[in-house]
Amino acid sequence: MVVGVVWLPLEAHPRPTHMSVNKTAAEAEAGMTLAEVREEILRDYRICVMSREASLLGRKEVLGGKAKFGIFGDGKELAQVAMAKQFRPGDWRSGYYRDMTFMFAIGELTVQQWFAQLYAHADPAAEPASAGRQMNGHFATRSLDEHGNWRNLTEQYNSSPDISPTAGQMPRLLGLAQASRVFRQNTALHAHTHLSDQGNEVAFGTIGDASTSEGHFWETMNAAGVLQVPLAMSVWDDGWGISVSKEHQTTKGSISTLLQGFQKEEGTNGIRIYRTKGWDYAHLNKTYEAAIALCREEHVPCLIHVEEVTQPQGHSTSGSHERYKSPELLEWYKEYDCNVKFRQWILGFKPGGEAIATAAELDAIEQEAKADVRAAQKAAWAAYQNEIKAERDEALGLIEAVDPAIAAELKAEMNPGRKEILSAARRALVLNAGAPAANDLHAWTERALEENRERYGSHLYSESAQTCLNVPEVSVEYAPDAEMVDGRLIIRDNFAALFEKEPLLLTFGEDTGKIGDVNQGMEGMQARFGELRVSDTGIREATILGQGIGMALRGLRPVAEIQYLDYLLYCLQGLSDDLATVHWRTRGGQKCPLIIRTRGHRLEGVWHSGSPMGMILNSVRGVVVCVPRNMQQAAGMYNTLLQADDPALVIECLNGYRSKERMPANLGEFTVPIGIPEVVREGNDITLVSYGSTFTICARAAERLQDLGIDVELIDARTLLPFDRTHRIAESLQKTNRLLVVDEDVPGGASAYIMQQVLEEQNGYHWLDAAPATLTAKPHRPAYGTDGDYFSKPSIEDVVEKVIAVVRE
């Protein structure tokens, strides 16, 4: 059964590269000639067989040793061609590693590029999705020009960058769809025509049926039904999750049946649910045309459950599905193979009483596709190998002059990679240090290592002119009679200034809207700027993050609020796997300048006093991490970040909202430099480094220590990623010769990270006359209450005693 399917006029959604869905002869007369119908059907068939040939040949290339791993879209071709017909310029995809046919069909992936990714060709010209950084089947388009500026996203087909974790694509899909709602309903944004055509874009999502068991899927679909955003979710249902059948995956064995409670009815929100077969060309086309029309025009989310999809080659090159699938099922795969069924349908389709194609014509298409795929594979392999062979030949001459035996080993390698070349060069240098010819080889090796650091490691953070590192510092200003106010008022009024001057800015989270967040940092903002820009969400951190990622990918400036730092764990997977890697895994092809606002460190209770900074730091490289000591510093960081294009996490101090601070005069203007610590108190006896809420403890301890004759140099790290770019802490050590790092993470957490940065990166150990020390929270979680806090986290007395111990060593 297909729910709510209606026919639409042929001309309703014209596409520049594909015509509308095929009709009967009578319907074709109204909008398409039979010749055009025939042309479209045969083009679709060619895409399907070309994609299948790529999958088959790709598997052979992996098993033959030319590539490391292969995962393919065979069996899903026909549904993806039908979906592609409804995909317009400006639309967005958030899918997964089976979608090769779709990418071929919209013209954003060539077969040669597909093979280039299979071989890990680390050149964005050859492999524009990830420049060889991702395994095959991970697709993306390029949203940025060579300077890191937005292209016109409404004139191109857009795909967000795929990740491997199952259902990991779901949260960002929600944000991609919500952006259309924002662009449609906020008329102030209608002038941003390079980002949206007044919200007429659909966000297309795809997922394998087994992955619908993941929480991300349910959280996203529920939120989409609440928000009413143009999200079109396709489920490719082949009945398996690797070796586990859907009887063990899904209640009642059907995701569309299970979702019936989500069904949108008259006068309600929810989603529209459609069901179709992966081998039924005509029905697929009808279903997608109806579903996407409703989604695009009325912003009603939909789910298209594509059943009876096959998997001819099994899950991937990792193993054989013959181990766990029955012979009967494998025979059924052959009978209901979508390409086989499509061929049968074409031969039986006679709109004018005559078949639109003969078996011989289809045979010719298949042979041509096979030849074209083979040619593309050869071209991709040659392009990939030619670069490396040139590097090998250059290295061989230099290695031979130093160590002929190692050179001979390298020459004997079949299809060596850069690893083998550099490994040989470095071995030769180690074994022949001091050889006359070693200098030339050393110079070549250093140059090659630097080139490969760039080739595989660039763009972890923004490298554009808009990087946060380039935002000029603007000092905070105070009126002579500046009022002492609660810190929350500085945050509130600073955000108000930012909302006034930046129409792309919006914020959302649990309790963010109506009450202005649980600490009143957004008090009155929803009434002032509207529910579209300052909104509440459900309790669903993974998709709060996803909303931010998706909207930031589309050029909006979202501030996603996670109510407490302790709850960041609910969205840490997306923060680590998706947000932190966007810029790197596209080699600068996309950016995601999302700001995550949260609050943490000491307050009351096990799950309202967390400071798991080591866990965060080791999970989110690629994200700027700011740890302000007060609300003026936090406001300055927001002012900096909103002028930049890096993703960032700002952790406000939970116990700072009621602390009194002077109200700045230049709200929305003053900035805090990223990666530059601040020496808040100068001293000569010891360098004390801290951040966040613990910094206040250290400041009070420093006053007591002064009375004891110990002169503390107190430094606020301010940001942990990046950390002390100017080596200000090492400079302090040259004067004090002693170091203590204080925080409220567990032992070996962020304090150990800071110590590594100071001692190893900054060579701070040169200046020490005493062993460097850390003072941290206890290994257990913070206990409840004032006494629990005192005996769980560093106190003023702890800091004083630790400083005395270090100074007296």
Which sequence ranges carry the predicted segments?
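Conserved acidic/glycine
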Residues: 9-10, 16-79, 85-86, 312-529, ...
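Cofactor-binding active-site loop characterized by glycine-rich and histidine/acidic residues
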Residues: 53-234, 239-241, 245-263, 268, ...
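Thiamine diphosphate
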Residues: 77-81, 158-401, 405-420, 506, 654-809, ...
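Short beta-strand segments
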Residues: 95-97, 167, 206-207, 234-237, ...
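Phosphate/diphosphate-binding loops
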Residues: 281-301, 361, 585, 589-600, ...
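Active-site phosphate/pyrophosphate-binding segments
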Residues: 590, 600-604, 608, 621-627, ...
